[in-house]
């Protein structure tokens, strides 16, 4: 009795398909994390004029995503990320880090950190759905 075992290397095809899906994956991850950050900011009342919440944006090597509001300027948004396979998200508003990390007179609000943690389960689901081709 002969047993014939054949192993095929399909890694090149898998990597090519992953590379093809990368723009959609990164954009979906950016959408989810920004949505969760903005939702947390609303829940925790981290809104005064709306400029900071409106500036939450992301950038991938394929797209810069933002939704400008009347309170925002063009420089408020994250843009021009050229690093392969990454999503850069947050805000370029000059006081964003003070609200996130706090100051000697203001407690840290951790809106980026909390929103990111809240987004992780949904990001996993979205990525799985995209990779399965559903």
Question: Which sequence ranges carry the predicted segments?
Answer:
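Short, Lys/Arg-rich flexible segments
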Residues: 1-134
């Amino acid at each position: 009795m002969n047993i014939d075992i054949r192993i095929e290397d399909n890694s090149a095809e898998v990597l090519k398909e992953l590379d093809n899906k990368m723009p959609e994956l990164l954009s979906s991850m950016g959408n989810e994390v920004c949505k969760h950050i903005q939702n947390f900011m609303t829940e925790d009342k981290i809104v005064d004029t709306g400029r900071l919440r409106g500036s939450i944006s992301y950038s991938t090597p394929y797209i810069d995503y933002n939704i400008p509001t009347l309170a925002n300027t063009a420089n408020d948004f994250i843009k021009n990320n050229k690093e392969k396979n990454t999503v850069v998200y947050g805000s370029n508003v000059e006081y964003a880090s003070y609200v996130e990390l706090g100051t000697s007179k203001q407690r840290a609000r951790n809106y980026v950190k909390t929103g990111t943690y809240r987004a992780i389960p949904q990001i996993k689901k979205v990525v799985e759905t995209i990779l399965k081709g559903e």
